[in-house]
From Swiss-Prot:
Binding-site positions, ATP: 87, 105-109, 510
Cofactor comment: May bind 1 zinc ion per subunit.
Name of the top EC class for this enzyme: translocase
Name of the featured protein: Protein translocase subunit SecA
Cofactor(s) named in the record: Zn(2+)
Function: Part of the Sec protein translocase complex. Interacts with the SecYEG preprotein conducting channel. Has a central role in coupling the hydrolysis of ATP to the transfer of proteins into and across the cell membrane, serving both as a receptor for the preprotein-SecB complex and as an ATP-driven molecular motor driving the stepwise translocation of polypeptide chains across the membrane.
Record family assignment: Belongs to the SecA family.
PROSITE patterns: SECA (PS01312), SECA_MOTOR_DEAD (PS51196)
Subunit relationships: Monomer and homodimer. Part of the essential Sec protein translocation apparatus which comprises SecA, SecYEG and auxiliary proteins SecDF-YajC and YidC.
GO cellular component, one term: cytosol
Length: 911
């Protein structure tokens, strides 16, 4: 109430932003006559002039009016398109690092050229990020003539690209590509063995197309580079026989002999006591569990992992809803777009369990070698912006997570689409029959095209079957027909066209009323001017007929969990002031209604005695549905926020490791760095046998001599030194042993020569760093999976995760140092001196291995069975405590316990 009153007096924040930007638009428009009078050569020459002015200290904000005017004039001449004023507002929004919400068909692609041009003047590169390769290639080729006319280079990145071509694409002024490829290149760049092999040149400025899809829908999908782990396919096959023998418990707190309880809101499964006992007996009969042993003993946690995955695969994942079978493989279906996602695999053994369930060949599980999330990939950009047709419903999340404001850009022409109220039916069959009847009614009234949005492949195929029975020609666009996606969407606005699309497959391609005559022309082998004129004339007639019939009719067969996805479907109609109609058809059996809408609504509708073919249209029901969607959106936001809290911990460690890697690659020699490692490792080793501040009687000198001989291959007469010099204390001993070890290292290093020694040092340091970082990522995965159980002990899981992960990280740093020193000392003393050619070959082999690593996306959308990793995690934590070599202060900014006077993060907290 108060907010609306204040908004009425002062205007909303969005209105104030638009008012400010319109003043800048007036400046741009005032320059148009002057810029239009320039010759092509003079117009192109403006780009080097702007670059020079920028290098002389003029800001991009100051250059904006003139640069936008130049870009608009160039677009008029090269592309035959002039930016509208609302597109100029959108361009300003993007330049200022905000999200521009612009309705479908209003020209987001053209709008993006303005901010691209202005920010490319800095010479630091602009990344334009899209959701798929098709859109990246399309937009790059569409805008290439404009940017090349203005003297800017343009590149496109894609998977399996030649390294030289990809490096050139990143060096271009403007680089197009998918979010996946940009993210994977970031990870690959941090696995290279020389700086010359890096492709990306820094994260300066990014424009994300369909920003809501990438930053919201994809936020929970980590990017992972992985290698295969041990094969356990036989276990998946054996345990796959257990879930069919189990039955669900009907109510969570009412024991009825069920073996597990399904929480559909949380999308998780929890076993009951009877379930545990039954599974244990089955495993005993299979010979996988010893008689009398507990399933949850520390030695059997691998079985828990497999049982958990098998039950989830059978209970929570349905074929043609969550995945399809294609060429003998399980292919995940994106719940937000309905597109298949080849190459992506569910994590924690779930994908293998689904393969076992479907009787397919089971692919080995993967071990993570490098990982990040889109949240943590995009946040380091100096400036980030985005454009979409639907972001306002997620504005709070965009602001809180990414610091991005959403500006709603007004339409060029008024929006006249007729959004009708939802119709709610008793069951799905009644709903589907009503949809078919509505399609027949529309067909009888005129030639209006119809787009039917479904939530699942299954629903699209049911409707397709009913349309066939009714004799209605139609096209189906779902995960099984994705190859024809662009063609189907291009003609979905043709007269009498009926198109079924799963969620918003085809997003990014406008549906033009009357069809797309240019797409038809492109299909002809040798089109003549007569063909072009004929197709264009036919389109003009079809376009007018469709307008007279009321434009595109949108029929939603189900409400999505997110209002944003529903708005995307509605947004396909009513583009650029065209007419259109939209309506959703729902049933009490829809997942959203059944799980979230509330018993009161369902009870009321059943009490009304509705028949299958009768519908209800009531404000209370519509409000209840919207409230249900808000609840789901809030829950998903909390999940993403929680994921970010944990991944922020990983991200800080990742940044330290990657920064250290860059330093190692940049140094010509690591001698000083390695010698400091020697001293730290010697200090830690000696402390194990000669405790700090202890008396001589407590010293284990013999053990120290044995450790030096066995671990480092060095014979040192420590006992003899002590007998010769009674004043030799612990500190002096550390210094003397370190000096001896380093002296031998220097001697051997001199024999090798500086160049060979430097290459070998870099090889050992990077090899150890990468190997232990990989193991650390696996340990962090285990920690993450079981940390929620600390809540039962009245501990804060988030704080516990920070503490435990820090201990693991510090332990890893100590182990890396020990490994490097051990490898260098033993290899430098025992093996022949490698030639520069051999070392170069060694590095080449490492790079080939890195390039061969499997890229994958892991999905974490479904929670595991409660408590499945407790014991293994406790064992892991104990192991970390036992192996820790350096004291750990509570804060990384605290003074280092070694007494150096440096902060811990700059001393022993640094590799």
């Amino acid at each position: 109430m108060l907010a609306s009153l204040i908004g009425g007096i002062f205007g909303t924040k969005n209105e104030r932003e638009l008012k400010r930007m319109r003043k800048i638009v007036e400046q741009i428009n005032a320059l148009e006559p002057t810029i239009s009078a320039l010759s092509d050569a003079d117009l192109s020459a403006k780009t080097p002039e702007f670059k020079q002015r920028y290098n002389n200290g003029e800001s991009l904000d100051k250059l904006l009016p003139e640069a936008f005017a130049v870009c608009r004039e160039a677009a008029k001449r090269v592309m035959g398109m002039r930016h509208y004023d609302v597109q100029l507002i959108g361009g300003i929004t993007l330049h200022e690092g905000k999200i521009a919400e612009m309705r479908t068909g209003e020209g987001k692609t053209l709008m993006g050229t303005l901010a691209c041009y202005l920010n490319a003047l800095s010479g630091e590169g602009v990344h334009v990020i899209t959701v798929n390769d098709y859109l990246a290639q399309r937009d790059a080729e569409l805008n290439r003539p404009l940017f090349e006319f203005l003297g800017l280079s343009i590149g496109t990145i894609y998977s399996m690209q030649e390294p030289a071509e990809k490096a050139a694409a990143y060096l271009a002024d403007i680089t197009y590509g998918t979010n996946n490829e940009f993210g994977f290149d970031y990870l690959r760049d941090n696995m290279v063995f020389s700086l010359a092999e890096k492709k990306q040149r820094g994260l300066h400025y990014a424009i994300i197309d369909e920003v809501d899809s990438i930053l919201i829908d994809e936020a929970r999908t980590p990017l992972i580079i992985s290698g295969q782990s041990e094969d356990s396919s036989h276990l998946y096959t054996a345990i796959n026989t257990i879930p069919p023998k189990l039955r669900p418990q009907k109510e969570e707190k009412v024991a009825d002999g069920g073996h597990f309880w399904i929480d559909e809101k949380q999308r998780s499964v929890e076993m009951t006591e009877i379930g545990y006992e039954t599974v244990e007996q089955e495993l005993i009969q299979m010979g996988l569990l010893a008689e009398g042993e507990s399933l949850y003993s520390a030695t059997n946690l691998n079985l828990v992992h497999h049982v958990s995955a098998a039950i989830r695969a059978h209970v929570l994942f349905q074929r043609d809803v969550h995945y399809i079978i294609h060429d003998g493989e399980v292919v995940i279906v994106d719940e937000h777009t309905g597109r298949t996602m080849p190459g992506r695999r569910w994590s924690e053994g779930l994908h293998q369990a689904v393969e076992a369930k479907e009787g397919l060949a089971i692919q080995p599980e993967n071990q993570t070698l490098a990982t990040t999330t889109f949240q943590n990939y995009f946040r380091p950009y100096k400036k980030l912006s985005g454009m979409t047709g639907t972001a306002d419903t997620e504005a709070a999340e965009m602001k809180e997570i990414y610091g991005l404001d959403v500006v709603i850009i007004p339409t060029h022409r008024p929006m006249i689409r007729n959004d009708q109220n939802d119709l709610i039916y008793l069951n799905r069959n009644g709903k589907y029959n009503a949809i078919i009847q509505e399609i027949m009614n529309i067909r009888q009234q005129g030639v209006a095209p119809i787009l039917i949005g479904t939530a699942t492949i299954e629903a699209s195929e049911i409707l397709s079957s009913k349309l066939k029975q009714a004799g209605i020609h139609h096209e189906v666009l779902n995960a099984k027909q994705h190859e024809r996606e662009a063609d189907i969407i291009a003609q979905a606005g043709s007269p009498n066209a009926v198109t079924i699309a799963t969620n918003m497959a085809g997003r990014g391609t406008d549906i033009i009323l009357g069809g797309n005559w240019k797409a038809k022309l492109a299909k002809l082998e040798n089109p003549t001017p007569e063909d072009e004129a004929r197709l264009k004339a036919q389109w003009e007639q079809d376009h007018e007929d469709v307008l007279q019939a009321g434009g595109l009719h949108i029929i939603g067969s189900e409400r999505h969990e997110s209002r944003r996805i529903d708005n995307q479907l509605r947004g396909r109609a009513g583009r650029q002031g065209d007419p259109g109609v939209s309506r959703f058809y729902l049933s009490l059996e829809d997942d959203l209604m059944r799980i979230f809408a509330g018993d009161r609504v369902v009870a009321m509708m059943r009490a009304m005695g509705l028949k299958e073919d009768e519908a209800i249209e009531h404000k209370m029901v519509s409000r209840s549905i919207e409230n249900a969607q808000r609840k789901v959106e809030a829950r998903n936001f909390d999940i993403r926020k929680n994921l970010l809290k944990y991944d922020d911990v990983n991200n800080e460690q990742r940044k330290i490791i990657y920064s250290q890697r860059d330093e190692i690659l940049a140094e010509n020699t690591l001698q000083e760095y390695v010698e400091e490692m020697h001293r730290e490792v010697m200090q830690a080793m000696i402390a194990n046998f000669i405790p700090p501040e202890s008396i001589h009687d407590q010293w284990d000198v013999e053990g120290l001599e044995n450790a030096l001989r066995i671990d480092l291959g060095i014979e040192l007469p420590v006992q003899e030194w002590l007998e010769q010099d009674r004043r030799l204390d612990e500190e002096g001993l550390v210094e003397r042993i370190s000096d001896e070890v380093i002296a031998r290292y220097r001697q051997r290093r001199a024999q090798m020569g500086d160049e060979s020694a430097a290459m070998l040092e870099r090889h050992f340091v990077l090899n150890s760093l990468d190997r232990h970082w990989k193991d650390h990522l696996a340990a962090m995965d285990y920690l993450r999976q079981g940390i929620h159980l600390r809540g039962y002990a009245q501990k804060n899981p988030e704080q516990e995760y920070k503490k435990e992960s820090f201990n693991l990280f510090v332990n890893m740093l100590g182990v890396i140092k020990t490994d490097v020193v051990t490898d260098l000392v033993t290899d430098l003393s025992r093996v022949h001196i490698p030639t520069p050619e051999e070392l170069a070959e060694m590095e080449a082999q490492q790079q080939q291995q890195a390039e061969a690593m499997k890229l994958s996306f892991e999905h974490d959308d479904v929670d595991g069975l409660t408590g499945e990793v407790t014991a293994s995690q406790e064992a892991l934590n104990e192991s970390a405590t036992e192996q820790q070599t350096f004291p750990v202060p509570e804060s990384r900014n605290a003074p280092c316990p070694c007494g150096s006077g440096l902060k811990y993060k700059q001393c022993h907290g640094k590799i």
